[in-house]
Regions:
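N-terminal secretory signal peptides
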Residues: 1-12
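N-terminal export leaders
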Residues: 12-30
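N-terminal active-site segment of His-dependent metallophosphoesterases
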Residues: 34-103, 194
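Active-site neighborhood of phospho(di)ester-bond hydrolases with catalytic His/Asp-centered motifs
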Residues: 49-50, 87-91, 121-127, 204-207, ...
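Catalytic metal-binding/acid-base residues of hydrolase active sites
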Residues: 53, 93-94, 128-130, 164, ...
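Short acidic, glycine-rich surface-loop motifs adjacent to enzyme active sites
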Residues: 94, 196-214
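Extended active-site neighborhood of metal-dependent phosphoesterases/phosphodiesterases
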Residues: 98-193, 197-198, 224-234, 248-287
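Short, solvent-exposed aromatic-acidic interface loops
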Residues: 287-297
């Protein structure tokens, strides 16, 4: 009887252990969407976040502005574990405010959290970033010199684009624009063409307004932009935000990947952020968290 009691007790403890382990695995799976163990062939890892829309104001529709602080805290914890080489914020870091001082205060608060994830950050301007602020005010506050530029890391070329211009070439600022009138001006197009002609490395482009659609979320002259990207022969993918939903199109061999907005929805499960891994064989893997879908790019 004593041996039977010991056996029963062992089985109970075993079931309790297995149940606890299953709960832990389930909790971890709920944070990462399609996540895998870090691959030893990863040569560069980049953190991506878009459409945070932080603001100290009440919820409007599905946009829970104040919850962004909690969501970015989780993103910071998870992404720090992966040690990204740099972070890219794909636009709309803040939401609109009535005054310059209010927008700057919101920007300072959210950027403290974003810039703490790793040592290097890059910011794509979104229409909400310069709703009240000028571009110089926003860029000065986050410590970035230019709105569009390029740089190289680990034999990969990266391009940051700025589509916050009206059709007449006027830069967004001080509520002087309609959000549906997004354009890349001639000067920037000329720079982009020259930059890509001089570059022979595989290239990734970061944008806010979409370069792959003709609806209100698209850059009005995005066909001109795509032509330049295609003719370069080196552009692998474009990562963008603005429409707040997961989406993916391939046009002429270039992947246009739209990322989920962090601001949408309430609670931990409504978060969205990702890690882009560039592998030694030239392929790429987007590891999505929460609402962000994971993707593979050959």
């Amino acid at each position: 009887m004593q041996d039977a009691s010991r056996a029963d007790a062992f089985q109970i403890r075993r079931r309790q252990f297995l149940h606890s382990g299953a709960l832990l695995l389930t909790a971890a799976a709920n944070i990462r969407c399609g996540a895998t163990e870090a691959d030893p062939t990863v040569r560069l890892r980049i953190g991506l976040i878009t459409d945070l829309h932080y603001a100290d104001k009440d919820t409007v529709g599905s946009r829970h502005y104040r919850e962004t602080l909690t969501k970015i805290a989780e993103a910071s914890t998870e992404l720090k574990k992966l040690s990204p080489a740099f972070m890219v914020e794909l636009g709309d870091l803040i939401d609109r405010a009535d005054t310059v001082s209010t927008e700057l205060s919101w920007l300072k608060k959210i950027n403290q959290s974003f810039s703490a994830i790793c040592d290097e950050q890059h910011y794509v301007l979104g229409n909400h970033c310069v709703d009240t602020l000028t571009k110089q005010e926003f860029l000065g506050a986050v410590g970035q010199k230019q709105a569009w530029y390029s740089f190289d890391r680990q034999d990969v070329h990266f391009v940051i684009l700025d589509s916050c211009f009206r059709s007449d070439g006027t830069a967004y600022q001080r509520k002087n624009f309609e959000w549906t009138d997004a354009n890349i001006p001639a000067e920037e197009l000329e720079w982009l063409k020259s930059d890509l002609q001089q570059n022979k490395l595989p290239t990734i482009v970061f944008a806010h307004q979409r370069l792959d659609v003709a609806d209100n979320h698209g850059v009005r002259n995005n066909a001109d932009v795509r032509k330049i990207l295609q003719e370069s022969g080196n552009v692998r993918a474009v990562f963008q935000g603005h429409s707040h939903q997961n989406d993916l199109h391939e046009i002429s061999g270039i992947s246009y990947c739209t990322l989920a907005a962090m601001v949408e929805g309430t609670g931990p499960a409504a978060n969205g952020y990702s890690s882009l891994e560039i592998l030694s064989d030239g392929s790429m893997r987007l590891q999505g968290f929460r609402r962000q879908q994971s993707r593979s790019f050959s």
